UniProtKB/Swiss-Prot annotation:
Keywords: Iron, Oxidoreductase. One of its GO terms (molecular function) is cytochrome-c3 hydrogenase activity. It comes from Acidithiobacillus ferrooxidans (Thiobacillus ferrooxidans). Its cofactor is Fe cation. It is an enzyme of class 1 (oxidoreductase). This is Cytochrome c3 hydrogenase large chain. Coiled coil: none annotated.
Amino acid sequence: XTAVQTLDISPVGRVEGDLDSXSILEYFRNAILARFGGGLGKYAPFTGTNYEIGVTISGDKDPQAGLVVTPRESTTXGLNEPFYIKPYVSXGYIPHEDGALAHXIEVDGVVVEAYTQAELFR
């Protein structure tokens, strides 16, 4: 049995208005690398007040390449939603059948796919 390591990097705070994706991804990327390093091959779940991230860190693969940004239900009024960051494994991750791709954004030349909450949580 593999031990699961958890690192609390709260508080991240809420993201209201325009999502500064580059800053958030860089924050999580740095937190992952600082805690686990780049070659440990760990699956490292990170949780914060409004965000989660889980990426497989192996060899020279950049953790940023394994992220999905997903909308989270907001308890505040308005059109802007806070966001979750959840794992995305390009070699085999399949969204729920009843879900549809919401949109895609590009962060530093990397396309980060955004899915609705219903697609990742049933």
